[in-house]
Curated annotation (Swiss-Prot):
Reactions catalysed according to its record: oxaloacetate + ATP = phosphoenolpyruvate + ADP + CO2
Enzyme nomenclature, EC number: 4.1.1.49
Disulfide linkage: none
SUPFAM superfamilies for the chain: PEP carboxykinase N-terminal domain, PEP carboxykinase-like
Name of the protein described by the UniProt record: Phosphoenolpyruvate carboxykinase (ATP)
The species this protein was found in: Shewanella baltica (strain OS185)
Residues reported in the UniProt entry to bind ATP: 185, 204, 220-228, 269, 305, 431
Amino acid sequence: MADGLNRVHFNPSTAQLVEFALLRGEGELTANGALVAKTGARSGRSPGDRFIVREPSSEAEIEWGPVNQAFDPGAFEGLWARVEAYLADKELFVSDLEVGADTEHYQPVRVTTQYAWHQLFARNLFIIPEEFNRKDKPVWQIINAPDFVCDPARDGTNSDATVILNFAERKVLLAGLKYAGEMKKSMFSVQNFLLPAQGVLPMHCSANVGKDGDTTLFFGLSGTGKTTLSADPKRFLIGDDEHGWAPGGVFNIEGGCYAKCIDLSQKNEPVIWDAIRFGTVLENVVMDEHRVPNYKDSSLTENTRAAYPLEHIAQRKEDNCGAEPHAVVFLTCDVSGVLPPVSILTKEQAAYHFLSGYTAKVGSTEIGSTSAIQSTFSTCFGAPFFPRPAGVYAELLMKRIESFGSQVYLVNTGWTGGPHGVGKRFDIPTTRAIVDAIVSGELKDVETVHLDTLNLAVPVAVTGVDSNLLNPINTWSDKALYAEYAQKLAEAFTKNFAKYQVSDAIRNAGPKA
């Protein structure tokens, strides 16, 4: 479709976008029909290049700092205009999409991309509505210009690339970045800012529902098991990464999944395996000479990805919504090998561990990560994406848990028997058995043992799980060394938590250093 000097393709189909991507040399077809694209040096998010425009309407609500870096409004206007001018003679792809599968809490967004495969990604991950913007809300704009090169001296950026959110003007600018995950996380950050004002808790979590309508949430950083554990053949998927919890129910913020592919196997992750087909975008996945994806190959990055629409999953909740959750699971990947595979939390402990967000960066999704696996505290299990102060989200979580009576569990998908490099990681079947026990209600009123240093209640038995694994000290050959590591972890929790202004009940719910 002609539009001035350039050609603009409005709401193109999957087949058209795959065809354009191949013709333009943006990617290649794999043997399973997916489109594989490479992102170059930036194979993960670039947190140091992410900004929020500091303007009067939102300034007082945002927790400014290294995560939410301020950007000058005038500099934003200039850069937005330069990017628009740069794209004026380019072939472009445009779609009208939505973020939020809820009739009240959705945001309409027009996505303009320079690359066909980026548009395919957006149409896979955002929601393609039957009727666009039925409540006639103001429309957000995303512009993604990966070949535009930023000049820090001219543009006010930190490097040759940037991601900037402007809440007042409802604009998201992505320039100089090929990693498509920046698009989805930008709109997640937008909803993370907007939803709390509407009494809705935005969550970095996956969600599924059983045949009886019981909803389970899985919070966790990338690589801790959100996508894998929510893709359960016995349950129906709501979504794998971003949700809102409103009074009365849970809804997916997205319309697709962005699954990690490293070491993907049909045996361990059949739902994800089967979803990778024509229409799926594979990011930085290496193929063999017959175009068969080699999911074990991390030569480009550990952070290999598959982006596919929820329609690629047979067992899904078609309206992308569910009831309020009976069970809430905090997934932590403990590299110290100290935490038990499952703990049952009080609501005060839930608030403590939600604010702490203790876990590991596993095959980090951020560029510049020097170690494949390192421990971290990530507030709300997603610190890079939450613009408001952490307490806002923690208070909303407590409110939702109390009003509905949800039970919260801490599940360790990391190491046992010793730290990373000495112990071994819990295998997926063990964690699945624990999750099965959680969703069935088996762990609601069971006998527990209290781990004093960690201040956690651990069940003495879980169906399908070796009882020796449940109390972590049993898996360490050197019990004194375990006690030493447990004390170190408790001290790390206490030190990290000192920054939070909370009630004594919440502060005392943490480990005892």
